[in-house]
Amino acid sequence: TPSDAVGESALPPLDSRYTQASGRVFMTGTQALVRMLLDQARLDAAAGLATGGLVSGYRGSPLATFDVELWRANRHLDGHKIDFLPAVNEDMAATIMAGAQQAEQQPSTTVDGVFGLWYGKGPGVDRSGDAIKHGNMYGSSPNGGVLMMAGDDHGCVSSTISHQSEYGFIGASLPVLNPATIDELISFGLFGFALSRYSGLWVGMKSIAELIEAGASIDLAPLPAFARPPLVNTADCLLYTSPSPRDPK
């Protein structure tokens, strides 16, 4: 049989997509998002930061199985202090993201910051506009950051209406990333966290069903090094520094 010819010992373990540092691995779009979270924790550890991660959102196609992949990868997430907290709705998840950016300001904190990933389908972006806009006005932590992951069903294959989330993100003053390949879900996600930390903004990222539900063999890239111009913390700094929203002017 084919399995006898190859030999079980020659087959890589299923979780190599999360543990392998280099080489070629197979993963789906939702698994790439899990890998991205683990790589962010690895980036922070390499930089000497003791960060935590937080994932929260509400399931819906094309991100309907993202929570399943997070539960399956639970031991890997736990090993990197990444918590998964499914929300009652997308609004609550966005509010959780705002609170997580205050972590290092708490006297009892044990982390240097918390990076947060929100997820939801297009209508979730629509209904959460108030929470997203207010969270973005509060800002992000320099050692945390917020990435808002929207799953868009352009063809209305499994939704009541078609949706395109860029407009909702732009309306809330979020920059938007639009990865086109499985490996870009990882690289764009890491860039999004770096951008959020530097700019003080929450960062939107979208994916269509044809990508997030697909799978591919990809070559794992080395962890990136992002060049950041010096940031001077002033009274007008855009990062989260106080318990009240920054002046939108």
Give a label for each model feature.
Residues Y240-K249:
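Single conserved hydrophobic/aromatic residue that forms the stacking wall/gate
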Residues A172-P175, G189, A216-L220:
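Extended, well-folded catalytic/binding cores that form a central cleft or groove in large enzyme
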